[in-house]
């Protein structure tokens, strides 16, 4: 096999963005009762998990409930991903909490805000006409977290395409197209293109087609770089 000419952690990141091989162990917690979800999260952390996902279905989630959910969790020590019904509002609560506690610059946090794939592709519409309100809010969140390099605001949920029957190549193509559309829409909303790219992440599916899935991830890194 011909040498790619780059090491792991080097452009175009075919072998990954990290030079080490320390993978995180991720588990998602369904949040119905914040206290119960917190107990489950602490149990998972004590069992070796170091990346937590919180799926919050409840609308009107409050700052007090967020404090209950994250009680006893050392936020800088782990990675967190928030998804659910009103992720934009939850993002505002989380960012405010991190800034209040002085941990925003250390925190590794991502939000599954995805009006293009979860909204337009899956449901046929945005949260507002033409999506202007959606992208204005995303632009605002990006500006708030401009200096926090480990906080990602937008997640391209590529797994939705796979679950709808797309091939590996189609999933990759649709995901990159959505990523490009995000950059275009966010720059139209006044966000610098480089900053918009830093605040975006991709979430792909993994099927049993082992070698092609590995090739998909490698291709995704190279093409997006």
Question: Where are each of the predicted segments found?
Answer:
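Extended amphipathic alpha-helical segments enriched in small hydrophobics
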Residues: 213-225
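Catalytic alpha/beta active-site cores
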Residues: 1-209, 213
């Amino acid at each position: 096999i011909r040498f790619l000419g780059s090491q792991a952690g080097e452009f175009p990141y075919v072998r990954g963005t990290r030079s080490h091989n320390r993978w995180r162990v991720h588990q998602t917690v369904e949040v119905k009762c914040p206290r119960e979800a917190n107990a489950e999260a602490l149990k998972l952390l004590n069992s070796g998990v170091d990346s937590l996902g919180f799926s919050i279905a409840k609308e009107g989630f409050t700052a007090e409930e967020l404090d209950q959910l994250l009680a006893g969790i050392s936020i800088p020590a782990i990675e967190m991903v928030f998804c659910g019904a009103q992720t934009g509002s939850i993002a505002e609560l989380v960012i405010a909490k991190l800034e209040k506690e002085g941990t925003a610059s250390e925190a590794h946090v991502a939000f599954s805000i995805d009006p293009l794939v979860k909204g337009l592709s899956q449901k046929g519409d945005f949260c507002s006409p033409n999506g202007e309100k959606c992208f204005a809010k995303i632009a605002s969140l990006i500006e708030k977290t401009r200096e926090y390099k480990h906080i990602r605001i937008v997640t391209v949920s590529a797994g939705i395409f796979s679950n709808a029957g797309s091939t590996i190549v189609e999933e990759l193509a649709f995901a990159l197209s959505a990523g490009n559309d995000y950059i275009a829409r966010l720059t139209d909303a006044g966000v610098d293109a480089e900053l918009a790219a830093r605040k975006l992440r991709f979430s792909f599916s993994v099927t049993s087609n082992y070698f092609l899935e590995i090739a998909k991830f490698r291709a995704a890194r190279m093409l997006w770089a």
